[in-house]
A protein has these predicted regions:
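Short, surface-exposed "cap/lid" segments of acyl-processing enzymes
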Residues: 101-158, 174, 178-181, 334-337
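Alpha/beta-hydrolase active-site loop
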Residues: 162-183, 202
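Short beta-strand/loop motif that positions the catalytic acidic residue
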Residues: 317, 323-325, 329
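Conserved loop-alpha-helix segment in the C-terminal half of the alpha/beta-hydrolase fold
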Residues: 333-350
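N-terminal cap/lid segment of alpha/beta-hydrolase-fold proteins
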Residues: 59-110, 172, 370
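Active-site nucleophile elbow and catalytic-triad environment of alpha/beta-hydrolase enzymes
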Residues: 290-313
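Alpha/beta-hydrolase-fold enzymes
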Residues: 11-46, 181-296
């Protein structure tokens, strides 16, 4: 009898972890006016927002498993891509790079359209989830430019003693300007994932001129306010594990580029670093305090995080926006959803979409155990992009 109860408890525990009793439902959509021409046009062209998102049956309703699978695999399958690498030497000597992938067919609207993609933390054009989206967009007639965050490419040496940071828009800005010169007749759509979504949103809101080059922006799974999210991530066991994993990843990057990041000239420029503190850090807070704040000249973590957070710039954005979060994202808790929700409900041209499932950048769907190679988030990006392009074409 005891063994029976233990077996039942085990099965109930697995059932609870997998969240299998949760229903697959359509996303919640927050907008100002459902009867507006913009919203009606978008929803008519984007059935994905009105239909249930059905995660992979066995494990897809667990935000933690979605996030872990994304973190370990990126995507189930991803193509080998051939693109053109572009370099930009910045004023401090840093070499910013981005890769351009050309359309594999003509766009259905007949025009020239480019997705400008900013990946998540420590990611680049080689990241599996980026490659999956790029290939799908190419097949849909889009040119795709992907920013490589400083230090993220393993085979590219740094030429200046710095890596990326959460809120720097310099590299994205230079990619935009270079793309404008190379493809002056192309219409741009901004796409950002997680930290990259923070960067593109901040970039768009920093200066009104930045928005003139884009017909829309797409912010996917970002947290909006780093100061607000800090206590949430450090208060619970599993989020702390994710933070630890991200910290270890960045420490490996620092170690890989150690010779230039902590060279004599770097120490002369930024002051001496406490190497023991940096490489013994077990959280992003500790690492940022020991490294990022010192390199960037901030006196406190709050000052640094305040400067980085896109929520301070969001209200300046006036172009059409698609903003996405998942309720079960372990890195972006629902308490942060107030910022984009209030923004969307005050704008005529913004959709804030919140799914019940998806985790952090997971959004795997289809199948019982093995998901489809194409995720829900890939399909959502392309449907929204096509809808905005169609609206643009009608207005011309």
């Amino acid at each position: 009898m005891t063994e029976w109860f233990l077996g039942l408890a085990f099965l109930l525990g697995i059932f609870k972890i997998l969240n299998m009793s949760s229903l697959a439902v359509a996303p919640d959509i927050y907008i100002k006016d459902r009867s507006s021409a913009f919203v009606k046009s978008i929803l008519a062209a984007c059935p994905i927002f009105l239909e249930p998102y059905i995660p992979t049956l066995i494990w897809g309703k667990s935000g933690h498993i979605q996030t872990i699978v994304y973190g370990k695999m990126g995507r189930v399958q991803y193509p080998d891509l051939k693109g053109d690498r572009h370099e930009h030497i910045m004023s401090d000597g840093a070499t910013s790079t981005f890769d351009v992938y050309h359309p594999l067919s003509e766009h259905q609207a007949g025009g020239d359209y480019s997705l400008l993609v900013c990946p998540g933390i420590a990611n680049c054009s080689e990241s599996p989830y980026i490659r999956t989206l790029v290939h799908m967009a190419q097949r849909g007639g889009y040119r795709v430019a992907v920013l490589n965050h400083l230090g993220a490419l393993r085979d590219v040496e740094l030429t200046s003693p710095r890596i990326f940071d959460y809120g720097s828009t310099q590299e994205f800005h230079h990619m935009v300007e270079d793309m404008r010169k190379i493809y002056p007749n192309s219409s741009f759509l901004a796409v950002g994932f997680s930290m990259g979504a923070n960067i593109i949103t901040k970039y768009l809101g920093e200066h009104p001129d930045h928005q003139k080059h884009f017909i829309c922006g797409m912010s996917l799974c970002q947290g909006y306010d780093v100061i607000q999210v800090r206590p949430q991530l450090m208060s619970f066991f599993l989020p702390r594990l994710y933070v630890y994993a991200m910290t270890e990843n960045i420490k490996k990057m620092l170690q890989r580029h150690r010779n230039i990041l902590f060279s004599a000239s770097a120490q002369e420029k930024y002051g001496s670093f406490n190497m023991e503190k940096i490489f013994s850090s077990t959280s992003l807070e500790a690492l940022d305090e020991a490294y990022s704040c010192k390199r960037l000249g901030f006196k406190s973590l709050d000052d640094y995080y305040q400067s980085c957070s896109s929520g301070n710039y969001l209200n300046n954005v006036t172009i059409p926006m698609f903003i996405l979060n998942a309720l079960d994202d372990p890195l972006v808790p629902p308490c942060l959803h107030t910022i984009p929700r209030e923004f969307a409900e005050s704008r005529d041209n913004c959709l804030y979409v919140v799914t019940r499932h998806g985790g952090h950048l997971g959004y795997f769907e289809g199948g019982y155990f093995t998901p489809s190679p194409i995720t829900w988030i890939d399909r959502a990006v392309l449907e929204f992009a096509n809808a905005v392009v169609t609206m643009e074409e009608k207005q011309q």
